[in-house]
Amino acid sequence: MIINDKKDQETKVDDTTTLTLTREHLLNCQFSAWYKLYKSITPKTRIIKPLPEDFVNYLSEDGVILPDEEKTSYGSDSGVFEEYSDDEDELDSYVSKLDDFHPKVQAVIDEFGAVAPKLNWSSPQDAIWISPSNSTRCVTVNDVYLLLKSSDYIAHDLTMLDKLGGIPKDFSFELVLRKWININPALEFRCFVKDRELIAVTQRDQNYYEFLIKLKERFLGEIELFFYEHIKDTFPDSSFVFDVYIPEPYDKVWLMDFNVFYPTTDSLIEWSTLVNLDATSPSFDLDLLLIDKELRNASFACQRHSQNKVPMDIVNASMDTEAMVEMLRSQQREMDRLDGDQGGEASATGDTTGDSVANETTAANTTSQDS
């Protein structure tokens, strides 16, 4: 990838095609840029904008410190959750300056009952392993902060514009709080638009669902109609990606998000194939790509974002019982070896070993249940 700090990013996707990502493309895809236009077809959402500079700094700093529960009266979590860092005092100082911001978040939670947070572009899906609900569902202010602080996706949002010429003067970070919906991942679809033509639709979740086969043509027809009625001529870019959700009874399409038409956007179809699809060609036939049954136990058969949640050995082991057992045995052998090296301290170390193995098991189970 070629990174031009003054303007754009470019990626060569095949021998003849280069895609360009501009700052304007990114800005057009941030939530507040499009939500008002599509509000009637998007789940209920509240946007807190602009975010206080102290809150942005709080998200940017390493470590996790949450507001004192007794001070905020938000939720039943312990008052402070910490991961020690050299900048802990500075991080704590940011938290202490957010007393006026906490009630704004709480007000939206009170309105909706539960919320799913995101920043301008990204949702902290990679951090749900740390959530008690194993999802992005938040019922307290601390739930929201913990997810945002634990997410690599959110950290990326905070620096994304720096690689494209910097942050515009009129730009501000925003906290998006969507009313919580218990989404069935099988019913989420990603739609690719090139030159204002819908060129491909794919399943978003990387697992096989047999029931989707019978519904494929119905979903494709509904998505195509939705595109022509609401999206085709209204989004500012001519090429882009949008996500939809079609819950039971499958009679309404909900717009969930917009993404750039660029390889940084995940796709089940190779980008070298996507850029060569031509909806104006007489031979073109729009298709909805579903995960094939044969791929169910292959590389696609995993939960989205699992690589971001816990170490890869745990992710891999969670998909294979024998691998899980072997991983835990290996850890036990290593701990036993360390016990032997420490001599008289072996007994104390042995107590810790049990906790360590139990924690690894819990982490693996969390990964395997990702939604």
UniProtKB/Swiss-Prot annotation:
<dbReference type="GO" id="GO:0051301">
    <property type="term" value="P:cell division"/>
</dbReference>
<keyword id="KW-0132">Cell division</keyword>
<comment type="similarity">
    <text>Belongs to the CDC123 family.</text>
</comment>
<dbReference type="GO" id="GO:0000287">
    <property type="term" value="F:magnesium ion binding"/>
</dbReference>
<comment type="function">
    <text>Regulates the cell cycle in a nutrient dependent manner.</text>
</comment>
<dbReference type="Pfam" id="PF07065">
    <property type="entry name" value="D123"/>
</dbReference>
<feature type="region of interest" description="Disordered">
    <location>
        <begin position="334"/>
        <end position="371"/>
    </location>
</feature>
<dbReference type="GO" id="GO:1905143">
    <property type="term" value="P:eukaryotic translation initiation factor 2 complex assembly"/>
</dbReference>
<feature type="compositionally biased region" description="Polar residues">
    <location>
        <begin position="349"/>
        <end position="371"/>
    </location>
</feature>
<keyword id="KW-0131">Cell cycle</keyword>
<dbReference type="GO" id="GO:0005737">
    <property type="term" value="C:cytoplasm"/>
</dbReference>
<dbReference type="GO" id="GO:0044183">
    <property type="term" value="F:protein folding chaperone"/>
</dbReference>
<protein>
    <recommendedName>
        <fullName>Cell division cycle protein 123</fullName>
    </recommendedName>
</protein>
<dbReference type="GO" id="GO:0005524">
    <property type="term" value="F:ATP binding"/>
</dbReference>
<keyword id="KW-0963">Cytoplasm</keyword>
<dbReference type="InterPro" id="IPR009772">
    <property type="entry name" value="CDC123"/>
</dbReference>
